Amino acid sequence: MNTKKILSTLLLTALTSVGVNAQHQFTVSTKPGATIQPTMYGIFFEDINFGADGGLYAEMVENRSFEFPDRLMGWNTFGDVTVSDVKPAFDRNPHYVTLANAGHREKRTGLENRGFFGMGLKKGMHYDFTVYARLHTLQGKEAKFRIELIDEEDRPISKATVTVTSNKWQKYTSTLTSDKTVEKGLLRIFLEGSESVDIDHVSLFPADSWQGMRADLVKDLADLHPGIFRFPGGCIVEGTDLATRYQWKNTVGPAENRPLNENRWNYTFPHRMYPNYYQTLGLGFYEFFLLSEKIGAEPLPVLSCGLACQYQNDDNDKNAHVCTADLQPYIDDALDLIEFANGPVTSKWGRLRADMGHPAPFNLKQIGIGNEQWGPLYPERLALFVKQIRAKYPHIKICGSSGPSASGKEFDYGWEQMRRLGVDLVDEHYYMTPDWFLKNAGRYDNYNRTGPKVFAGEYAAHVHGLDKQPTVAMNNFEAALSEAAFMTGLERNADVVYQATYAPLFAHVEGWQWRPDLIWFNNLESVRSVNWYVQMLYATNRGTHVLSLTEGGKPVEGHENLYASAVYDKTAKAYIVKIVNAGDKEQHINLTFTGLKNLGKGKLITLHSNDPRATNSLENKTHVVPQTSDVEAHGNMLSVKVPAKTFAVYRF
C-alpha cells in the first residue's frame, strides 16, 4: 500500500472540499489595490559560510595565487618549492612559487591542493586547468610539469603535462576529465625533468561553470525567480576595519590581478573559526551584475559608508570610521559604480564595463549605502552621499538602514534620520523566533504611508533549542511556515513594503558560520531548504496588485492561527490567494470573491508537514516540497479545508 500517496490524496481532498458550514468566511475584493513591485521578493548574497570562494564561485583551488598571509596555506609541498615575488606576473598579486629539481632522480618536487573541504569531481566532467608559468632562468630551454586529479585513495583519475618554453610569463591551459565521481579529491602538480619553473594563479574550474559560477547553484537562484538581488553584503561591506572593507574597484578587471581581501567572517564565531577564509574577489561586481541579468533580478549593490563593522569596533577606534572631511573617496566609489553600471562606453567606468564584455548598461536603479549601521555616525556620513548622488543621478533610488534590530531606540532613531535625509528605502533586518514572525504578520499594517518605503533586507526565523543555540536542524518546516505567515503581511502591505530578501543565501555543509540558510551545498551538489520553497512560491505567485482579503472586515493575520493574503496578476489575468494554517487543527474556510460571477477552475499548491522539525537535506532533498493539484470554485465561492501546518496557494 502506498501510504504516502494516500495521505497526499487525503490532504488535497481536504484542501478543496466544498462545504456550507465553514468555520471562517473570507471576503476577497477583486478591485485591484496597491501595486506590488517587481522587486518584491528577491535574494541577498553575502560571502559567509563559504558562499563565494568554495561556493558559488566555482574555482576549486584554494589560495590559487599564493597571496594568503601564509603564502602556502591550502598547499602541501614536497621537494624544492620556494615562494618569491621578483618580477611577478601580476602587480597586485605578486607572489608565485618556483619548482626546482629535488636533487635526486627518485625524488619529486611539487604541490598538492585539496581545495575547499576537498575537491568534488564528477565522472565524465571536464575540468579546465589554467596556470601562468615561465622558465625560472634566462638560460632555461624547456620545463615540464605534470598535473593530476587524485581520488581519496591517492590514485590519479586524470592527468596531463604542461610544457613551458619561455622565460616570460605566459598562460597555459589544459583540460582534465574525471573518470569517477569523487567527493574529496585533490589537484597534484609535480615537476618533470631538471629545469626549474615559476608558476602562479593555479586554477581549476568545472567546464560547465557559468561566468565562473557553479552551474547548480546558479540554477538554484534562477529557479527562485527573484525580483531583486542585493550584494555583496552584509557585514563584509563594512569589514572588520576600514582596510578590509569590501571595495568594488578591486573586484573588476582581470580576475588574476584582483587583490586578496580578508573575509569578515573568518574569526567572528569562536566555535566556527576558519583562518583560511579569504576573498579572492574572482566573484566581483561585474559577475554580480551579470548574475542579476541572468536570473532576471534588479541589482542592488551595497557600498561602505565609511564605517567599519560596529559590532567589532568602538566608535572611537582609530580604524573604525573615516572622518567626514575625508569621505569623498567613498562617495566617489558610489558615483563611479553607477557610471560602471549605467554609463556610456565613452566614460571611464563604462568603458571598463565594455572592455570586460558588456557594452550595454546594466540598468542599475538602486544603490545601498551602509549595511546595518546605527547611531549618529551613520546619518552624518550618509547625508553627504545622498547630496551628491541626488545631484548627479537623481533617478537612482538610495537605500539607507535602520540598524540591526527590529525595534527599539536605535531602530526608531534610524527611521527618524532616514526620513530626515529623504532616502527612498530603509533596510530593516530581523532574525527572530518563529513565534515572533507569527505575532508580527501585522507589523506593517500601521506604518506611515509617506516617506521612505521598507526594504526587509535580511530576515529569517531562527529555531532555538533549550540551550538557546541553533538546533541541529539546518532549516526546518516550523521556521519556513512562520515565514510564510509573516510574508502575507509583507504582501498585504505592498504599498509600504517595496521588497524583501531572506538571509543568508548559501552555506557549505562543512564550512558554515551561520544558520539557517536558504541553500546548502557540498562540493558535488546542493539542496533547497523548505524555506527556499516558501520564497519560490511567493516569487512565482507575486501578482501585480494587492487585493483586500478580510474576515469580518479585518485582515487575516493570526486569528485561530490563520494568515492570508490575496493578489491579482494583471499580466496573467490570475487571482491568487495564499493561506497559512499555523495551528494544530484543520480549518474550514469559504472564500467569496466579490465582483466576480464565476471563479472557475484553478490550481492548488501546498507545502505541508506534520513534523515541525522536518528538513530537506542532501540525503533527502525532497522531504518537504510543494504538491500541485486541480481545484474548482462554485460560482464566486471557493470552499476549502486547510489542514494543520500547511501553506496553501490557490491560483485561478
Predicted feature residues:
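Surface beta-strand/loop "capping" patches
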Residues: 123-125, 545-582
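Catalytic-core region of carbohydrate-active enzymes that cleave or remodel glycosidic bonds
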Residues: 387-388, 394-397, 415-418, 424-541, ...
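Extracellular and organelle-lumenal recognition/adhesion modules and their flexible linkers in secreted
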Residues: 23-280, 298-300, 313-328, 371, ...
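Conserved, mostly hydrophobic/aromatic
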Residues: 43, 131, 225, 292, ...
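An active-site-proximal structural segment forming one wall of the substrate-binding cleft
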Residues: 179, 185-186, 206-226, 281-291, ...
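Active-site groove signature of glycoside hydrolases
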Residues: 192, 232-233, 305, 310, ...
